[in-house]
Amino acid sequence: MAPFVPYHSSAGQATIVKFGGLLTTEFLEPPPGRCFLFRQTYRHTVEGPIPENLRKLINSPHKPKGPPPHFHQFQTEYFRVETGVLGIEVDGVLRRITPEDGEISVKAGSVHRFFIHPDSPESMTVYLSASDSGNDYQLDRIFFENWYGYWHDALLHDGGIDWIQFLAIQDGGDAYTPAPAWVPFRRQVGYWTCVIVGRWIGGLLGYKPFFREYTTDWDFAVAKMKGSVFQRHLVHEAFGAEKSWKQQTELEARVKPENAEFEQWTEDMSPTPLMLKPLAYEAGEFKGLQDQSANGVNGHATGVEAKKKQLGDMTRRRSGAQE
């Protein structure tokens, strides 16, 4: 398969909603010693009329109710249930966690998974955080923005998870899929499979761990990828020179440039006035379509009589130039 291209954008959002509300993540300021903190809510289902592909996913074995089994090589992860019941399996031991249990930890290297427990009512809300290893690739906001963005798009719109893309993203967040339990040294095998296939081979084939469409702090993501010789070629840095919209407007000329005999093709030559409504966007936000006209014409077209005169003047100029 070709390297993945996102289907939606969620960068810059403190709260991201995936799978039609089945999963909601709220990014928060982390406490000292932790590299991220978010509050996350899983629902058992989404009621009411929803798109067919979402209903099919909810009714399938692949319904998002928690991440697959994984381990973190360098970080300890922390969980604190706010409401509902969290199911968590750590190194084969299954536990049922409620708000009364307070904060629990999963040590680095422990194979674990967590999920909304069947005993939980309609939803389950939990606070998650992790220790700060100081590594380029670790559990942090960038990783979770990209993992949840990809998970959503892959299951709903892309026909499922691409194994190389999955490993590339997981490797970008110190999250590694262990080998089956019967494989000796399953953690080591899982770790090096993610690194070799996800980072090294995937990087050479064009697979990125992070995407601009999902990532709020893109400068940080670029710095992470530049740290790997296998991913450095995937990084584009011209975005750093892009000016803000305000700066772009300051560069706009006060008058339209003239183009000599090529001018007519840069003007509105239609004899019919172009009637436009008031702008529907303000500061990038959609304000809704309006019925009334802004001012009769849009300023780039003229009335019929004026247009006839304009066309006549252009015709005379062309004729004079050809004589």
From Swiss-Prot:
Keywords: Cytoplasmic vesicle, Oxidoreductase, Vacuole. GO terms for molecular function: oxidoreductase activity. GO terms for cellular component: cytoplasmic vesicle lumen; vacuolar lumen; vacuole. Patulin was originally used as an antibiotic and specifically trialed to be used against the common cold, but it is no longer used for that purpose since it has been shown to induce immunological, neurological and gastrointestinal effects. Genotoxic effects of patulin with dose-dependent increase in DNA strand breaks in brain, liver and kidneys have been detected in mice. However, more recently, it has been proposed that patulin might also have anti-tumor properties. The keyword Transmembrane helix does not apply. It is an enzyme of class 1 (oxidoreductase). Pathway: Mycotoxin biosynthesis; patulin biosynthesis. It comes from the Eukaryota. Its EC number is 1.-.-.-. Coiled coil: none annotated. Its main location: other. Residues 291-323 are annotated as: Disordered. Disulfide bonds: none annotated. Residues 305-316 have a biased composition (Basic and acidic residues). One of its GO terms (biological process) is patulin biosynthetic process. It is found in: Vacuole lumen; Cytoplasmic vesicle lumen. Probable oxidoreductase; part of the gene cluster that mediates the biosynthesis of patulin, an acetate-derived tetraketide mycotoxin produced by several fungal species that shows antimicrobial properties against several bacteria. PatJ acts with patO in the vacuole to convert gentisyl alcohol to isoepoxydon. The pathway begins with the synthesis of 6-methylsalicylic acid by the polyketide synthase (PKS) patK via condensation of acetate and malonate units. Belongs to the oxidoreductase OpS7 family. This is Probable oxidoreductase patJ. The gene is patJ.
